[in-house]
From Swiss-Prot:
One of its GO terms (biological process) is protein folding. This is Protein-export protein SecB. Homotetramer, a dimer of dimers. One homotetramer interacts with 1 SecA dimer. It is found in: Cytoplasm. The gene is secB. InterPro entries: SecB, SecB-like_sf. The keyword Transferase does not apply. The lineage of its organism: Bacteria, Pseudomonadati, Pseudomonadota, Gammaproteobacteria, Oceanospirillales. Keywords: Chaperone, Cytoplasm, Protein transport, Translocation, Transport. HAMAP family: SecB. It comes from the Bacteria. Its main location: cytoplasm.
Length: 159
């Protein structure tokens, strides 16, 4: 073997920074909402986005929107964009997609959850502890949906 033969590239993953990118708290029906018994309907919407910052740096943004309602009145709406910059190199395209779509959001979620809890309390509402999210399952479902959508036009072309 030649000494000049290139060794296989080792995968690199490093968290470089976690930060709060955007934050919003609204309590449109306060103070009247404080007079009602606290039995809210809580809805959580989440989304992830990523973009390449440099050759081996990626920004991943986890957006959580929490809406708490009492009957038909909105008690509060909290939106948090928790972001991170990750150094990622040496992964296959499939590994990179899963890392950006599942692994990085798993790292960011506890920070977003803590911020949401703190904002609810600062807004004079009871603490709101969000349940863990299985980003691996969400990612796997998104991949499955994408594959089904790609297969559908191929099936139509056959008929």
């Amino acid at each position: 073997m030649s000494e000049n033969a290139e060794a296989p590239k080792q995968p690199v993953f490093a968290l470089q920074r976690i930060y709060l990118k955007d934050l919003s708290f609204e309590s449109p029906n306060s103070p009247a909402v404080f007079q009602s018994e606290w039995k809210p309907q809580v809805n959580m919407d989440l989304n992830t986005e990523n973009k390449k910052v440099s050759d081996n740096q990626w920004e991943v943004v986890l957006t959580l929107t929490i809406t708490a309602k009492l009957a038909d009145k909105t008690a509060f709406v909290i939106e948090v964009q928790q972001a991170g910059v990750f150094m990622i190199d040496g992964l296959s395209p499939q590994q990179l997609a899963q890392t950006l779509g599942a692994f990085c959001p798993n790292i960011l979620f506890p920070y977003a959850r803590e911020t949401i809890d703190m904002l609810a309390v600062k807004g004079s509402f009871p603490a709101l502890m969000l349940q863990p999210v299985n980003f691996d399952a969400i990612y796997a479902e998104a991949v499955k949906r994408q594959q089904a959508q790609q297969a559908a036009p191929a099936e139509e072309a056959k008929h």
